[in-house]
Every structure is written in structure tokens, then in C-alpha cells.
Amino acid sequence: MNALLSNPFKEGLREGDTQIGLWLSSTTSYMAEIAATSGYDWLLIDGEHAPNTVQDLYHQLQAIAPYASQPVIRLIEGSKALIKQVLDIGAQTLLIPMVDTAEQARQVVSATRYPPLGQRGVGASVARAARWGRIDNYMAQANESLCLLVQVESKVALENLDAILEVEGIDGVFIGPADLSASLGYPDNAGHPEVQRIIESCIYRIRAAGKAAGFLAVDPAMAQKCLAWGANFVAVGVDTMLYTEALDSRLAMFKSVQSVSTAKRSY
């Protein structure tokens, strides 16, 4: 099969496009397809906090595939075996959480690339990503089209940010506001002025290094701030949060109950 692999999400980052995304935590292909018809530039399938199996991820990739929205898979960790499985089922963009050092970043890069660039295991004949062995020159194309994003979300990671940004093969850095604020001593308070100052500084440093900067902001005002600071891939909501807010709001129209959605909520 003389097919060329492409990754529109990665191409958009290279061109400096601003890409607006949505977090998918519901673990179902049905909900993933509904989200894919909404027109978001990218959809994050969460394999870290949501109870997704590899097969769940596979079905959601299938559901999103016919649409323009681009899937990004966040793994529970950057293990070589798990990365291999998820790339084989067709993921082209990965988000790896809790990357604290440049050495961790290099290990993740190696796990995502075929030799001689890395240590990804070869099994194209059983991989959806290679159309079960039918894509010519698949290994070289896979190395080129892969987009690798890492999460900086701890005090240690902040100290090592410049070194992480120097690692070849990292396309972007995503700031994890919930874990970062907790690590800095402000749990559940990403809006604290000191946390905000650090987030703005991180976005500037990431973009200055020629990498893409990402963020999840469930508050629209915070999302606008991050975009103004230079973040170029920003998730502006979480499906489960949007669902619960809608359910609570609708119930409050008919029953005298206090909607939990009126309280301050964070991811």
C-alpha cells in the first residue's frame, strides 16, 4: 500500500497554529464519536486518570478516525511496553505524564522510535497503525509522523524544564496545573498568583525553546489567559465535567436542590 502517514496535529504545531481541544474521560467510543463531531481540533483520550484499557483506547481511536478532530492519548506512565502497544493500535500523538527530568524524556523518546533512533519493538504485521503490514516504509514514516508531548507538573520538573526542552524528539510540553499547584504548595488552587506567574513563565520558556506549549483549563477565563501567554494547544473542557454540570443544571430547573455545579470546581 503506497500510503503516506500524516499527523495534522503535529503539522499544526509546527506551523504555529492555535489548536483547541477537549478532554475525554468517559472511556466510551460512543462519547468519543459525539465529541469528534463537535469540531474540536484535538481530543485527549485520558488513559491516566480515566479507567481506560488498551482496548478502550483502540475503540475510541476507531470512533474518532472518520472526523477532522485529532486524537491525543495520555498514558498512565511512560513505560516502553505500554507505549509500544498504544502506538501499534494507531496512536500518533502521545502525552506522557510526570516527566521530571531530561533523562526520563530521553527514555520516552527512545520508546516511541524504531531503531536506529530508538527501541520501539517491531510488529507491523499485527498493527492497526501499519494497516497490518500494508503501508510501505512504515517504520520510517512512523518515526517522522509521531508527535510526542510530555507533562511538566512538579517542582522538580520546573527545575529541570530547560534540560527537558533540549531533548531532541520532544515536540511539546504540557503544563499540568492541578499537580503543579499541589507540588508548589497550593493544592487545588491553580489560580493562586504565584502559580499563575509560574505557568506564564513556563509557557514563555517552552515557546522560546521552539516547542509547543499546552494546557488544560476548565475555566474559560484561564484558557484565554493561557492563549494570550502563548500556549498553542489548549484543552478547554472535560467531557465528564461538562456532563455533570449539564445534568445538575437541568435538575435544578425542576427541583429545589442546590446544584453542585454552582461550587468552584477544578480538574
Swiss-Prot record:
- Indicate the enzyme's highest-level EC class: lyase
User: What residues does Mg(2+) bind to?
Assistant: E153, D179
Q: Which organism is it from?
A: Salmonella gallinarum (strain 287/91 / NCTC 13346)
In alphabetical order, the GO MF annotations are: 2-keto-3-deoxy-L-rhamnonate aldolase activity; magnesium ion binding
What positions are marked as the site Transition state stabilizer? R74
Q: Where does the entry annotate site (Increases basicity of active site His)? A: D88
Q: Which cofactor is recorded for it?
A: Mg(2+)
Q: What name has this protein been given in UniProt?
A: 2-keto-3-deoxy-L-rhamnonate aldolase
Detail which positions bind substrate: Q151, A178, D179
Known partners and oligomeric status: Homohexamer.
Q: Does the keyword Magnesium apply?
A: yes
Concerning its family, UniProt says:
Belongs to the HpcH/HpaI aldolase family. KDR aldolase subfamily.
- Which E.C. number(s) belong to this protein? 4.1.2.53
Record flagged with keyword Metal-binding: yes
Residues the record marks as active site? H49
Organism lineage:
Bacteria, Pseudomonadati, Pseudomonadota, Gammaproteobacteria, Enterobacterales
